[in-house]
Amino acid sequence: MFRLLTHKMMESVKTASVASLVSLLVTGCVTSIPRSPENVCGIFEEKRGWFLAAKRARDRWKAPVGITMSFIYQESGYQATARPERERLFGVIPWKRKSTAVGYAQAIDATWKQYVSDAQNAGDWFPKYRSNFYDAVDFVGWYNNQSQRQLRLSRTDAKNLYLAYHEGWRGYQNRTYEKKKWLINAANKVETRARRYQIQYLKCKKKLSRWYDFLLFR
C-alpha cells in the first residue's frame, strides 16, 4: 500500500514538473530583450519557447515566421510591456497615452478583445495576455489571417500586411497610409527584415526542432 501511494505521489510530481516546464518553454521570458534581435536564429537559440510559439503560429495561421517576428520587432522591439509614449499637456505635463496598445504586438484593446472572442468561439479558453509572447505571436498570425481574408492580401506580402496591421482593415481600404510617409518607410523596413528573418529561419529551423515539440503545444 505504501509503495502504491509513493508511486502515485511520484507520478503527480512528474506531471506537475512537466507542466511547469511546458509553461516555461512556451511562454518564454517576458522581461529580457534578445541579445541578437537582428538574427532570428540567435533569438530562437536564446529563447526556445519563442521558437515554439512562432512555429505554432505558422502552423495554425499559415503565417511565415519571418513576417510574424518582423512585426513583433517593429512594434515593440521585443519588449513585453511596451506601451506608446504619453502625450504632453502644454508640452510638459505627462498626459494620456496615444493609444491603448500594449505588449509585444502592440495590440489595442478593441482588437485584442475580438481576438480573444474568436479564440473562445473556437474552443480556446486559455487566458490570454499581451505581455505573453505565445499569445502575442498568435495574435499577429490571427490578424494577418484576417487581413488575407478581408483584403485579399497575400500571406507573404509583409509590406501591405503591416500597413493593414497598423491602420486597421477599414483604414487600409481607405488608403489612409498614403498620407503617412513615416508609416510607409516603417512598412518597407518590416518587409526587408521579414525577408532576412525568413532566410535565416530556413537555415536553422531543422537544428532547433525536436521530435517532442508537438507535446509542448497547448
Which residue ranges define each predicted feature?
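Glycine-rich, phosphate-binding/catalytic loops in enzymes
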Residues: 87-91, 181-184
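Sec-dependent bacterial lipoprotein signal peptides
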Residues: 1-29
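Short, aromatic- and cysteine-enriched interfacial helices/patches
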Residues: 2, 90-93, 211-218
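Second-shell loop/turn segments in exported
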Residues: 39-44, 54-58, 94-102, 122-134, ...
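Export/targeting segments at the very N-terminus of extracytoplasmic proteins
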Residues: 28-89, 145-152
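Extracytoplasmic and endomembrane cell-envelope/extracellular-matrix remodeling and assembly machinery
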Residues: 30-52, 56, 188-218
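Alpha-helical segment that forms one wall of the substrate-binding/catalytic cleft
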Residues: 104-160, 164-172, 190
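Catalytic and substrate-binding regions of cell-wall glycan-acting enzymes that process beta-1,4-linked
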Residues: 96-99, 156-208
